[in-house]
Each structure stands twice: as structure tokens, then as C-alpha cells.
Swiss-Prot record:
It comes from Syntrophotalea carbinolica (strain DSM 2380 / NBRC 103641 / GraBd1). Belongs to the complex I subunit 2 family. Its EC number is 7.1.1.-. It is found in: Cell inner membrane. It comes from the Bacteria. One of its GO terms (molecular function) is NADH:ubiquinone reductase (non-electrogenic) activity. It catalyses: a quinone + NADH + 5 H(+)(in) = a quinol + NAD(+) + 4 H(+)(out). This is NADH-quinone oxidoreductase subunit N. Its main location: membrane. The chain crosses the membrane at residues 5-25, 31-51, 63-83, 96-116, 117-137, 152-172, 188-208, 242-262, 286-303, 312-332, 358-378, 393-415, 436-456.
Amino acid sequence: MTWNMLLALLPLLVLFGGSITVLFLSERRALLSAAMCAVVAAGFAWWPASLEAAGTPLVASNLFARGCLTLWALLGAATCLLSDRYRGSRKLAAREYAALTLFAVLGMAILSASTSLVSLFLGLESMTLAFYVLIAVDRENPTGAEAGLKYLLPGFLASALLAFGIALVYAATGTFELSAAISLSMAGAPMPSIALLGWTLIMAAAAFKASLAPFHLWTPDVYQGASAPIAGFLASGSKGAVFAVLLGSAPLALIVPLRPLLGGLAALSMIWGTLAALRQTNLKRMLAYSSVVHMGYLVLAVLSNRSAGMEAGLFYLLTYSAATVGTFGLLASMVDSGGEPQDYAALEGLAGRSPWRAVLLTGLLLSLAGFPPLAGFMGKFVLFGAALQSGYVGLVVLALLSSLISCYYYLRPVLYLFRVRQGAPTVPAFNNCERLIFVLCAGVTLVAGLYPGPFFRWFGAMLP
């Protein structure tokens, strides 16, 4: 291994070393140390010497890979900071929790930087294995173990599909390199059946990890059973990493026979997720089904023109992640010995008890719904515009209808926030870590909606 390759891997090595080191720290320091480690890894990704480093045969070291690593590291740091309240009230195994969070970030970074089918498998499975445990790690939560099992069992099937698909693609093309495998698969006319089957299985595995319908059935139960910070991390980072590799080094939309299947997954996700979210009274289950809809929107970025779709997709990932982490973080900030607020009724009268929580939650939910001038509106505007320019008129019309209907299920909990409720229990004050995260989430949601230009220039420069 050359010095340049070592520099390219430095952020990943920091994450790996940090995940081991925090196991030897005290419970009180583990979460904060893990958050600092994630931020340091993000900093090393932009270290001048690292910027000049070449990639390795398995992972890239371009601006796209470094930008994605920065986002995953910041999401991991936010998860650790938002989980600090659980350490005292929920008897959280903080050291193991912190180590697994860093390991999940490491898997996401490897996945989004993958240039080989081997690193794609390693990154995806590293991330998934960490989440298996993180979902069930809260010993005070009786539904956590059940949620972990519901994520584990279908995950085994998805991993088997992915491994079998990779084997078929290698048999058809003779290479593990992603770009070469896609090019060789498309070289024949028609595409060899074994290659098409292999890519279809890989796409099915990715659809499970991103909870695209009909591979989403695990999502509502897992979100409900997992702690709020982990549910937010799963909804943003885990799914975001899958779409990052689909937008970057593994653009499955270039394989023409897969485009109708991707379009079908997008349409089914928007329809199924919207209809299911309408019936929910549990906030975390509603957010789970709405995330299925948002993943359907992101498929439009994968299908769209390469450069426009990537810019729109990355911007949407950023704005969706900020709103999602902030929303789940607000639920986590209200946790007590009795657990997290679950049903809409638990939010009743929150505006009178904690006005800032109510205002923040309202703004983040409105951004997810796509209300201007918040970032969610701008994200949908550019995403739907890119898909429309690429000729996907039917999918864009369906996305617009789905977005319009989503206003109902996003506004329902908002109405509960501002109802008057006598004798409602008090909620704890924000701690310093929570204040920092909520200011950042609210800032991104507002600034990216009002001044999106700098973000698009940054994402345009990141295109591989």
C-alpha cells in the first residue's frame, strides 16, 4: 500500500480506531468521544494532504466520496449527542452504543465510496450489522428486541440476494469493478440473462435497505421499536448511503432494462407509503411510512439525467436528513423513565409546555411536507424538475399528488401541538448537545430553502 492510498483511507481508519477506543472509556465519556471522533474523521476527509491522495482499488477518494463521508459523520455525531439523555434515563450501554454508531458510519462511508462490488457488499453489511444491534440495544425498551429481530430476519434475505447477484454479475462480466461491470453488461445486445438477473437481485437488495415498497414491510415496526435517535439515523444515514452509491459509482439506471423496474418501485413507494401514512396515529410509524414516500422521490433522482439528477438527489438527501434527524431528535429530547412520546395525543398542548419544541417540530414537519420557503420545498422543486426534464412525466405527476396528500398527515400532529391541554406533564429542558443539533438542523432547513445556490455549487463540484 502506498502513502497516497493510506492518506485516502485515513478518515476510515479514524472511524475504525475510534470505534475500538470508545470501548475502553467510561460510560459518561463514550458518546461525546464518539461524536468528536466522527467530526475529526470528517475533518481529515478535507485535510489538504488527503485531498491529493489517490483512491484504492476498492474505494474512491474523490470529492463525492469525501462529501458523503462528511454527511454520514455529522449524522453519526448528532446521533451520539442526541442519545446522551438516554444514558441516564434508559440505562443505555453507552460504550457499545457509541462504538456501533461509529462502525455504522464507517460502513456508510465505505458504501458511498465503493468502486467495486466487493466493497459495496462489505460497506452495506458493515452498516447493517451495526444497526441490527443498535435497534435492540435499549434494554429498557420492551419492543426494541422485537424490532431488531424484524430488521435482522429480512436483512438475511437481502444479504443473500446481494451476494447471489454479485456472483452472477461476476460470472457474466469477469470483473468486480462497478463501472466496468455495468459497461460490460451493456455491451451485449441484448444484455445476457445472467447479468440482468444479477443486477436485478442487487437492485432488490438495495430496495430492501432503502425500504422501497414492497420491500418496506419491516420499516414501521423497526422505527417504532428503535430509540428515536437510532430511528432518525436509520432513516437518514442508512438510506442515504444506499442512494449515494446508486447516484455515484453504481448508477443502475444506466442499465436500460432496469429502468421500468426502478420506475415501478418509485410509483409503488409513493402510493403505498402515502396511503399507509394517512391512517397512522403513532408519530414514529407515520414517519416510517412517509420515509418510504421520500425514498420513492429519490428514485426519481436515480432515473434522471446524470448530472441534474445527482445534484438534485444530493440536495434532497441533505434537506431530508436535516429534517428527519431534527424531528426524531425532538422526540428523543422528551424521553423520560416512561419512554418516548409515541401517539399524536402525547404531543397535545406541547406549545404551552415547551414553545420552542413546538415551533421546531412544526418547522421540520412542514419542511418534510414541502412547504415554502423551507428546504423541503426547494428539494422537491429541483428533484421533480430534473425528473420532468428527463421525460418521467407520469412519475412526476404522481409525486406531486403524493406530496399534496402528505400535507394532511404532516399537519395532523402539528394541530395537536397547539391544542390546549390542562394538567399535561412537564417536559425536560434542552441540554447543550440538543441545542447544538437543533440549531444546526433548523439552520440547514431554513438557509437551504432561502439560499440554495451555494449548496448546488458545492454539490455540482462533487460530481464524480
